[in-house]
Every structure is written in structure tokens, then in C-alpha cells.
Amino acid sequence: MSASSLIKWVCYLGDIAASGFLNSIATALIAVLHDAGDNMFNSKEEKKLVDILTKFYKMINKQSDITVPVGQDLQRLALLFANLRSVEIKKNNETDFSNFFTTKLPMHNKFFRYDTK
């Protein structure tokens, strides 16, 4: 098993655990470690996805009522990461990754401009 595969599985299990079993501080720590692992080991396309999801989280955080804990938003993102990580992203042409992303986050076109090039 390669180092990148091991890190990917650790991140995947962390996503699942963080999605429902840990408090918001532990979830945030896992999210930071998750992003570090993605940036170090994953493909260019997955790094783009992490960047988009980071922007998505910042948008959620800015629009949330400050009296509501951010743990719920973090749990939703952890579930989304787990869902995305469990599916192979096929890239036969330059629109495949963008189409995959659009089906997983249909709202992204309203908030972000995403180019595959």
C-alpha cells in the first residue's frame, strides 16, 4: 500500500467519524489535517475540489448565525468529503471532472466560477 493510499484511507475514515461522532473542535482539527493530506498526496483535480470546498465552507460560515455552532456545517462537509472520496472521478475529457463536481454540489454554479483548465 502506498503512502498516498494510506493517507487517503485515514482521511476517509476521519471524514466518516467526524460526520457524526466527534465535537466541533475535533471535527475542525480533522478537516485541517484532511486538507493537508489532500494537498500533499492527492491529484491536481482533487486539490481543486478541496479548494472549492474550502471556499464553500467559508461561505457557509459567513452566512451562518453566529449563535449557531459551526459543528453542524463541519459535519455536513465531512459527509460530503466522504461521499466524494468513495466515488472514482473519471476523466476522459476536460468536462468530466466539472460534471462530476456539478452533480455532487449542484449549487456551486450560483456561487463559484470553476474552470477545468
Swiss-Prot record:
Its main location: membrane. It is found in: Membrane. It is a single-pass membrane protein. This is Uncharacterized protein RC0051. One of its GO terms (cellular component) is membrane. It comes from the Bacteria. The chain crosses the membrane at residues 10-32. Keywords: Membrane, Transmembrane, Transmembrane helix.
